Design a protein with these regions (language model features):
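Beta-lactam-recognizing serine transpeptidase/beta-lactamase-like catalytic domain environment
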Residues: 1-31, 36-286
């Protein structure tokens, strides 16, 4: 929305214009990234299309339990996206890292496993600049800490940060069946005139395809099917975000972070952010 809420000094907030933040202010985005996480798992052979997993709280050595927002039971890949299962992604990530989950097991990964995920995320525009025609753009933030538990945070969108523009490019790439396009503000340039009329067009910005996501078409179609279930199935967590008559697809997300709530310069107040990305109609996005 290009707006920012700031403390007003009286316990409330004031809203200011923050259009630049769309491309300069990355944040943890939550479960909206699970489409890309699922695609990595398909690519690496960690899961198969239609595979079922038990959604249950997991426990790794030396850590607290990690769970989904509720225990979802036995679910497949479509259900995992529609119901936003964390545990399905956790178990897939463990397999990508070469582990089969069992209770209280040690879980250590190295940079190469993070790279597998980040390389695919970048093909969607997450973790790289989108290429928008503006002089300044953030590519988001990431850390070199490769603790195993942080990989599990990563796959559910609670580790690396992304800008709203990057998330827009990511969902557009899914809508475009794997082709990532450069976003742009410029439409065309007209020749100068001596009056107030538009001169002849001397330059038109043409669609610029940046890359194609390296995956099988059937895998991307499966992610698209999962995103469609999010917004159209009776159990989908995004079914109330867009009128079903538009035949939408999308993904919800919730992330936990910290903010400076009292203006003291300390980012120390826990906060929860919600996100939704989507497109419609599903088979011919507008």
């Amino acid at each position: 929305a290009g707006k920012q809420a700031l403390p007003d000094g009286n316990g409330g907030y004031r809203i200011i214009d923050y259009t630049a933040g769309v491309v300069t202010s990355p944040m943890t985005s939550g479960s909206v990234v699970k489409g890309a996480s699922m695609l990595v798992a398909y690519n690496q052979g960690a899961i198969k299309i239609g595979e079922y997993q038990q959604d249950e709280c997991i426990k790794l050595a030396g850590t607290k339990q990690k769970c989904s927002w509720k225990t979802l039971g036995r679910i497949n890949d479509i259900d995992a996206l529609a119901l936003s299962s964390n545990v399905y992604q956790f178990k897939a990530a463990m397999k990508v890292a070469g582990y089969q989950y069992h209770y209280n097991m040690p879980f250590k990964v190295d940079k190469s496993t993070f790279d597998i995920y980040r390389n695919t995320f970048q093909e969607f525009g997450l973790g790289v600049q989108t290429g928008i025609d503006l002089p300044v753009e953030s590519k988001g933030t990431s850390s070199d800490n490769t603790a195993g538990g942080l990989l599990l945070d990563f796959v559910m969108g609670q580790y690396d940060t992304y800008t709203p523009m990057q998330l827009s490019q990511y969902i557009s790439t899914i809508a475009n069946r794997g082709t990532r396009y450069q976003p742009h503000l410029l439409k065309e340039v007209h020749k100068a005139t001596d009056d107030n009329s538009l001169g002849e067009v001397i330059y038109t910005f043409e669609a610029n395809a940046l890359n194609k996501v390296n995956t099988k078409e059937e895998y991307l179609d499966r992610v698209r099917e999962g995103f469609h279930a999010v917004t159209t199935k009776s159990y989908g967590l995004g079914r109330n975000y867009i009128d079903a008559s538009h035949d939408p697809s999308g993904k919800t997300g919730t992330s936990q972070s910290f903010t400076d709530s009292d203006g003291d310069g300390k980012i120390d107040t826990p906060t929860v952010s919600t996100a939704f990305i989507g497109y419609a109609p599903t088979d011919s996005p507008k």
